[in-house]
Design a protein with these regions (language model features):
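Alpha-helix-loop-beta-strand connector modules within alpha/beta enzyme cores
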Residues: 132-144, 202-211
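Mid-to-C-terminal alpha-helical segments outside catalytic/metal-binding sites
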Residues: 2-49, 53-56, 60, 66-107, ...
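Short glycine-enriched loops at secondary-structure junctions
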Residues: 113, 157, 213-217, 338-339
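Catalytic pocket-lining loop regions of alpha/beta-barrel enzymes
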Residues: 169-327, 331
Length: 376
């Protein structure tokens, strides 16, 4: 194949990925009980806020479901005997747009939720086809509602050459705003060497990468606590993939990628000190973090500060307090996790006593700086 810059691309082989967990494929499962009791009729995410929305509000964590994707998801859940979640089944582009208007969302940046059953069950070729289909559906939504949507294009990631072609198509043909990755693909987090050619191409393009977590195949219902593994495991998997990117040197080596992580960075704000303590060579003789050849030449805290984080399900005062200690608020964007959670989480942000400039940045300014097309 030929790369987008005209240079010959090295032929890469696909690699087997571990089977997806059959019990806790994503954050959706912690709501599955509500769906089983008929909560789908309520669709709480579609309720308008009683408090007026900001003049401009950009949601960088906004899910969408092409019909073929919904069908494949339903089949994967049937295979695993997982109850269907009503808000996902009820989603249509018309309902989603109506909900945005009611809640005062100016722009929603589209991304897929993490659904390993859809990705892995039929193999790399089917995953490639699904990624293409979803990209095209999302791009159509962007074209149909100018200024109201952006697109983080999903990549299949199971075959390197196919994924490089997907990147070229997403940016050069569909004009995607950025890329949508899962935190892991089977048994590999994003710092794994298998993904090196993919991330190098995204670095060359100075891409924004939005990372959405899922329950890892290692940590299904048999190893997690509680009825819904996603409640605990989803934020932990964000931490796993950030640490894999850190320790592999990817964050340092590929400086032109702009990373955006979900849910306030998972548990990174709470574990940052522990991570730094263990991998700082002053505390741990096996670490090689500092120095010109280290994975964190400016220190681990500096690497975490360079990343971007959204506020989806992270507006609790304790969570936001930790995030504020970790990064400047210029690195934080507004996210909702629609349709699983309400659009109006800005009300909780307004109760945190943030400076007016910081609040305005979270609501829209930081996203506009990260994704300049959204300024129009």
């Amino acid at each position: 194949m030929s790369r987008a810059d005209g240079t010959a691309a090295t032929k890469h082989t696909s690699i087997g990925h571990g089977a997806a967990c059959g019990c806790g494929a994503s954050r959706r499962h912690f709501l599955a009980g509500a769906a089983a009791f008929g909560a789908s009729a309520a669709l709480p995410a579609m309720q308008a806020s009683a408090q007026p929305a900001p003049a401009k509000l950009i949601d960088t964590h906004h899910h969408f479901y092409p019909p073929q994707y919904q069908k494949a998801w339903g089949e994967s859940e049937d295979k695993r005997k997982i109850p269907h979640l009503g808000v996902q089944l009820a989603w249509t582009r018309e309902h989603a747009f109506e909900a945005m208007d009611k809640a005062g969302i100016t722009t929603g940046v589209l991304s897929l939720p993490s659904t390993p059953g859809v990705w892995f069950d039929a193999g790399a070729e089917a995953a490639h086809d699904m990624a293409r289909l979803c990209c095209e559906f999302g791009a159509e939504m962007v074209r149909d509602r100018p200024g109201r949507y952006g697109l983080f294009a999903p990549l299949s990631m199971l075959d390197v050459d196919a994924t490089l072609k997907e990147i070229e198509y997403a940016f050069d043909t569909l004009k995607a705003d950025g890329i949508n990755l899962q935190s892991n693909y089977g048994d590999k987090w994003l710092g794994h060497a298998f993904y090196k050619p993919i991330l190098e191409e995204l670095n060359r393009r100075k891409a924004v990468i939005f990372v959405h977590p899922l329950v890892a195949s290692c940590c299904d219902a048999h190893l997690s606590v509680g009825a819904f593994p996603a409640i605990i495991e989803v934020p932990h998997d964000t931490t796993r993939t950030i640490v894999s990117l850190l320790l592999s040197g990817t964050l340092t080596r590929l400086r032109d990628i702009k990373w955006l992580f979900s849910h306030g960075g998972g548990t990174i704000p709470f574990l940052a000190g522990r991570i730094e303590g263990f991998y700082d060579p002053k505390a741990f003789s096996g670490a090689k973090g500092r120095g010109p050849n280290g994975f964190a030449p400016d220190g681990i805290a500096a690497e975490f500060r360079r990343l971007h984080y959204d506020t989806a399900n992270a507006t609790h005062p304790a969570a936001m307090a930790a995030l504020q200690k970790l990064v400047p608020m210029s690195q934080v964007t507004y996210g909702t996790d629609y349709p699983y959670f309400a659009f109006d989480q800005f009300r909780e942000l307004r109760q945190l006593g943030l400076a007016a400039a910081d609040l305005a940045g979270i609501e829209s300014g930081n996203a506009e700086r990260l994704l300049p097309r959204l300024k129009t």
